């Protein structure tokens, strides 16, 4: 089938989703390069243990994205077992057969791309869209990829979780509604 549309897939643990994630999402939306954008919270990450439950992370994504015209997929959260990009790509390609899938990945994760589960098969299904961060070095790869430069915000979910647990202020790193959700649910040691 000829693929006449372009669909960006932005997956992540989103533990929690923060303004850095939203900055990338808004850049993708403003670029007008994609007919659709699907945000996919990871269900059971292969490389790290999520702190918040999958349901809380999904709800924070829903809250953060608000009325943006974006699809939020719960396919990984509903799938039992470890979440792998290949399984998600297969499922989303079946649901979007006329779309070329573009897998959004940060330059830090792209540096480790050769270690991903079934990477050769994944690379046949998607084109990687690498988000270059200031100061990052991207090595040449045999996988189809394109690069976008975004002035990334210096925010990390790990830093946010550690700051909450340590009682430090993090309001400037999160959308206000996500911060309220975290406080209300007592996530990451907040009270």
Language-model regions, residue ranges each:
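Nucleotidyltransferase catalytic core that binds NTPs
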Residues: 1-191
């Amino acid at each position: 089938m000829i693929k006449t549309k372009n669909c960006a897939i932005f997956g992540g643990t989103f533990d929690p989703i923060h303004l850095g994630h939203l900055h990338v999402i808004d850049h993708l939306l403003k670029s007008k390069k994609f007919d659709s954008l699907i945000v996919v919270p990871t269900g059971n990450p292969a490389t790290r243990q999520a702190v918040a439950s999958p349901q809380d992370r999904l709800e924070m994504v829903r809250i953060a994205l608000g009325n943006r015209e974006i699809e939020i997929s719960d396919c990984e959260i509903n799938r039992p077992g470890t979440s792998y990009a290949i399984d998600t790509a297969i499922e989303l390609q079946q649901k979007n057969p006329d779309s070329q899938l573009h897998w959004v990945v940060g330059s830090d994760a792209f540096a480790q791309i050769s270690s991903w589960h079934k990477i050769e098969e994944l690379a046949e299904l998607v084109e990687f869209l690498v988000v270059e961060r200031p100061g990052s070095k991207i090595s040449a790869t045999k996988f189809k990829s394109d690069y976008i430069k975004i002035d990334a915000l210096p925010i990390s979910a790990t830093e946010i979780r550690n700051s909450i647990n340590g009682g430090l202020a993090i309001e400037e790193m999160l959308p206000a509604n996500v911060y309220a959700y975290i406080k209300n649910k007592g996530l990451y040691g907040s009270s």
